[in-house]
Amino acid sequence: MRLALYEPDIPQNTGALLRLAACFGIGVDLIEPTGFLLDDRRLKRAALDYADLVDITRHSSWAQFCAARDPDSRLIVMTTTGTTPLHRFDFAATDTILLGRESAGVPEAVHAAADARLVIPLQSGARSLNVALAGAIALFEALRQVGRLPGGLPAR
């Protein structure tokens, strides 16, 4: 299981997602360009010291990400225009969950490359969740389904 971030533009959300990945023990694919420098203090503040615990693979473009991707890994795009509710999808341990830009989601080429396009059901009138929250919900559900949730309690 991996988390892919498509051209993220808010460093605090990227930092929160890196921390999430560290806590769940999964790798992150960072598809550039980003809307910030990777040494941005806001990213570091949100990630704390967890970013050092994450296997981060940087890709200079969408094309480079596609070329480097494991061909056995399904690409699962989280989108407000998804056709399958998150909780009705059967995840596999090798899936890559892709989150789009906070400001614009992902372009049509990314939608076209997806093996599945999932949506998190929301109350009527609600447009979307913060990308870090959506990532946390999606990743938890995926790891729960495949039996890969960490077994330990948080350190005290």
For each feature predicted by the language model, list its residue ranges.
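Post-transcriptional modification and biogenesis factors for structured RNAs
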Residues: 1-156
